[in-house]
């Protein structure tokens, strides 16, 4: 479901742009600071309701402007052109419009415009804490299980209530009512996540083997508590410890994706270039799995394509992305870095001082 038109106004250094992207590869060529990453950021905002570089609306709205606009049109699977848009104010107020209707939720944007982002800071998926890998898992579960979004929101609220009660409760029975519902939802979320990871593993390990054939890569899911013990028992058994800590130690909020290379944690073995290839492999695998399960196509956003990758690795990634037949936006400093990826269906956009021109 590619974007057929992208309109950006008052976004960072982009005063206004209106482009018609290819359904295949789209190359954004320009010097550092030219605005090419801002185009990717605008597409990301359109699908997520937030920037991948800043959580503050004021930092992405153009200086001396009170708001920004990003609008797009994309082709649905039945060849219907669907308009979507987002408007952000400096105070953080956000308005989402889908098919002409205002008041839509950010989650609905994510449903209609699934995106995968690969950028220079993307190593955190593999090298930082488990929250990044939980977000990776939950992106897939969100798109495959209709009940996940509401259930996960409820779990986070129940956890917050439980943590507050831990500070005042004198006996476990004061928490048992809340814990029944928390345990029920946590078990459902854990099962959804486990099922998703099991399905994704086959695709991901195959692509990882293509990108990094010299390594044996294994991916496993950790649910956040002992796999042989019901969560309700964990909550009751750990009541006193949780009280001492002041928060709920075990649960779906501690889930993780364990990735090992030749039996060793991935961050202890791979170089930066190899880590980037693995991140790319995981993102592409997630997009392919989405297509297999739902028929939806991801849009891939790749910032600073050449970073950490030699020409051979770039060619390997380009070949894999072309095989997905998905829409891809790629930023690069020079056209030489993406020359091998260019074909008759791709489009090149030159970016300079926030001005975008097709060329």
Curated annotation (Swiss-Prot):
Gene3D superfamilies, A to Z: P-loop containing nucleotide triphosphate hydrolases, RecF/RecN/SMC, N-terminal domain
Location(s), subcellular: Cytoplasm
Keyword tags: ATP-binding, Cytoplasm, DNA damage, DNA repair, DNA replication, DNA-binding, Nucleotide-binding, SOS response
Signal sequence, renumbered to the chain: none
Tree of life domain: Bacteria
SUPFAM superfamilies cross-referenced by the UniProt entry: P-loop containing nucleoside triphosphate hydrolases
Annotated ATP binding sites: 30-37
Any one GO biological process: DNA synthesis involved in DNA repair
Keyword Cytoplasm: yes
GO cellular component term of the entry, any: cytoplasm
Principal localisation: cytoplasm
One Gene Ontology term of the molecular function aspect: ATP binding
InterPro entries referenced in this protein's UniProt entry, alphabetically: DNA-binding_RecF (IPR001238), DNA-binding_RecF_CS (IPR018078), P-loop_NTPase (IPR027417), RecF/RecN/SMC_N (IPR003395), RecF_2 (IPR042174)
Family annotation (PANTHER family): DNA REPLICATION AND REPAIR PROTEIN RECF
UniProt function note: The RecF protein is involved in DNA metabolism; it is required for DNA replication and normal SOS inducibility. RecF binds preferentially to single-stranded, linear DNA. It also seems to bind ATP.
Family statement drawn from the similarity comment of this UniProt entry: Belongs to the RecF family.
Protein name: DNA replication and repair protein RecF
Gene name of the encoded protein: recF
């Amino acid at each position: 479901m590619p974007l057929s038109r992208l309109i950006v106004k008052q976004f960072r250094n982009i005063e206004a742009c209106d482009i018609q992207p290819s359904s295949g590869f789209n190359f954004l060529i320009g010097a550092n600071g030219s605005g090419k990453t801002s185009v990717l950021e605008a597409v990301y905002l359109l699908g997520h309701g937030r920037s991948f570089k800043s959580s503050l609306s004021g930092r992405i709205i153009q200086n001396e402007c009170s708001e920004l606009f990003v609008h797009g049109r994309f082709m649905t699977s039945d060849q219907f052109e669907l308009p979507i848009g987002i408007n952000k104010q400096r105070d953080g107020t956000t308005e989402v419009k889908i098919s002409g209707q205002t008041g839509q939720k950010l989650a609905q944007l994510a449903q209609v415009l699934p995106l995968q982002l690969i950028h220079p800071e993307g190593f955190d998926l593999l090298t930082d804490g488990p929250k990044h890998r939980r977000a990776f898992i939950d992106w897939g579960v969100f798109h495959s299980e209709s009940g996940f979004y509401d259930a996960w929101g409820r779990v986070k609220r129940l956890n917050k209530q439980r943590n507050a009660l831990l500070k005042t409760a004198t006996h476990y029975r004061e928490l048992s009512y809340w814990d029944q519902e928390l345990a029920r939802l946590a078990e459902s979320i854990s099962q959804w996540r486990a099922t998703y990871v099991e399905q994704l593993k086959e695709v991901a390990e195959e692509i990882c083997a293509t990108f990094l054939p010299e390594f044996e890569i294994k991916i496993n899911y950790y649910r956040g508590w002992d796999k042989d013990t019901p969560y309700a028992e964990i909550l009751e058994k750990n009541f006193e410890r949780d009280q001492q800590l002041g928060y709920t130690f075990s649960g779906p909020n501690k889930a993780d994706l364990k990735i090992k290379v030749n039996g060793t944690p991935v961050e202890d073995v791979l170089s930066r270039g190899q880590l980037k290839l693995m991140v790319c492999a995981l993102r592409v695998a997630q997009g392919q799995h989405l297509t297999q399960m739902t028929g939806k196509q991801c849009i891939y956003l790749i910032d600073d394509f050449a970073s950490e990758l030699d020409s051979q690795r770039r060619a390997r990634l380009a070949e894999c992305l072309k095989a997905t037949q998905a829409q891809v936006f790629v930023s690069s400093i020079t056209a030489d870095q993406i020359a091998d990826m260019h074909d008759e269906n791709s489009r090149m956009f030159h970016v300079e001082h926030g001005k975008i021109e097709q060329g």
